[in-house]
Amino acid sequence: MAKEEKRVVAQNRKARHDYFIEQTIEAGIVLSGTEVKSIRAGKVSLKDSYANVKNGEVFIYGMHISPYEQGNIFNKDPLRDRKLLLHRAEINKLIGYIQQKGMTLVPLEVYFKNGKVKIELGIAKGKKLYDKREDIAKRDALREIDRRLKENFR
């Protein structure tokens, strides 16, 4: 059996800064052919995108896929809502999570796995300003420790 490859195309770095990621889940996505070609070319942005459950189905909103240059009439709207592919049990679990106060679904990354486009969704809770400052302070402290250790081993 072939090894599963995971080639990350786009990441939502802002999501990890703005939210506490409680859990992640992998979902497929319904796309047209020209959208897949644009994603292969890396022309996708997850900035300001989010996912939500509507009528028992999960959709992603605000995900920008640039039109494919050679696609002409087959290109779709770059910001259209796109359906995510999940099992019913997974959707029910997501509904339970996002009905809790302060919880939301945030796309973390888009990647290819065995030739199929996948999205990693994070079940997230928003950070307050002081939480963000705390994370930045921790990161700076770790960076300083690494710098000092590197100097000592020279």
From Swiss-Prot:
Signal peptide: none annotated. InterPro entries: SmpB, SsrA-bd_prot, SsrA-bd_prot_CS. It is found in: Cytoplasm. Keywords: Cytoplasm, RNA-binding. GO terms for molecular function: RNA binding. GO terms for cellular component: cytosol. Belongs to the SmpB family. Required for rescue of stalled ribosomes mediated by trans-translation. Binds to transfer-messenger RNA (tmRNA), required for stable association of tmRNA with ribosomes. tmRNA and SmpB together mimic tRNA shape, replacing the anticodon stem-loop with SmpB. tmRNA is encoded by the ssrA gene; the 2 termini fold to resemble tRNA(Ala) and it encodes a 'tag peptide', a short internal open reading frame. During trans-translation Ala-aminoacylated tmRNA acts like a tRNA, entering the A-site of stalled ribosomes, displacing the stalled mRNA. This is SsrA-binding protein.
